[in-house]
């Protein structure tokens, strides 16, 4: 039956009587379907490409799991539940971070930034070195602390990686009172050299982020063992959904206690 149908379709489509209305309608219909199908394939290919691009960008700088406090602003990394998470076999990289707003100044230019203090194992969590556009991602060489700036921040400040001049970071003294007689004492400041710039093609990072060592961030913002978030990377064999359920159960039990 299918063979007969194909023969009939072939005869009407390629009949020598090309002036036939049936032939004309058939050709127009076939062309219309072909063009529509081709356009759909191209569109899906483009969307698939965008999905892969966005996914790869997020995987370069975002953690798989991010733990933030339900109440308040910080978590204590020495709390029993937090220390327990760090020991789980499913956790490949355990990274406490501090994220706070600050003012960044370079020569006669300044702009607000989101300072992110990270420990030495941050490259194992984020692979940020893969999106570095200039310099080398390095936060400490054993003697000097460094900052890595989003490419938008660096551009607006007019600073480049490995500049001989440091940027200055200022944040309000979180624990002290405002000194009206000498307002400068109400701020904590750090002079720090730029080791690299990075581009994630996401404004939330490129135009705001300044990454510094966790120890320096804790000094600037008057923290000791606290972190504003815990970022995790899981082992390749770990089911992310199952891990999230396990994590929620632990944290809920801890909060209830």
What are these regions (language model features)?
Residues 171-177, 181-254:
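Mechanotransmission and gating elements of multispan inner-membrane complexes involved in transport
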């Amino acid at each position: 039956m299918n063979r007969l149908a194909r023969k009939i379709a072939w005869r009407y489509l390629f009949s020598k009587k090309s002036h036939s209305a049936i032939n004309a309608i058939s050709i127009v219909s076939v062309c219309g379907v072909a063009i529509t199908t081709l356009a759909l394939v191209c569109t899906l290919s483009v969307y698939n490409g965008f999905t892969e691009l966005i996914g790869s960008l997020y995987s370069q700088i975002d953690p798989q799991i991010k733990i933030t406090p339900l109440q308040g602003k910080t978590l204590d990394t020495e709390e029993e539940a937090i220390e327990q998470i760090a020991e789980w076999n499913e956790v490949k990289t355990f990274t406490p971070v501090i994220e706070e707003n600050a003012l960044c100044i370079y020569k006669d230019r300044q702009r607000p930034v989101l300072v992110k203090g990270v420990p030495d194992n941050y490259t194992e969590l984020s692979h940020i070195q893969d999106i570095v556009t200039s310099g080398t991602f390095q936060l400490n060489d054993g003697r000097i602390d460094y900052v890595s700036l989003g490419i938008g921040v660096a551009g607006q400040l007019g600073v480049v990686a490995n500049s001989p001049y440091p940027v200055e970071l200022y944040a309000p003294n979180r624990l002290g009172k405002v000194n009206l007689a000498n307002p400068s004492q109400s701020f904590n400041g750090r002079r720090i050299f730029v080791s690299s710039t990075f581009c994630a093609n996401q404004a939330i990072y490129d135009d705001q982020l300044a990454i510094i060592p966790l120890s320096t961030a804790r000094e600037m913002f008057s923290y000791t063992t606290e972190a504003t978030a815990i970022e995790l990377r899981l082992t390749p064999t770990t089911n992310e959904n199952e891990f999230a359920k396990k994590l929620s159960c632990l944290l809920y039990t801890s909060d209830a206690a």
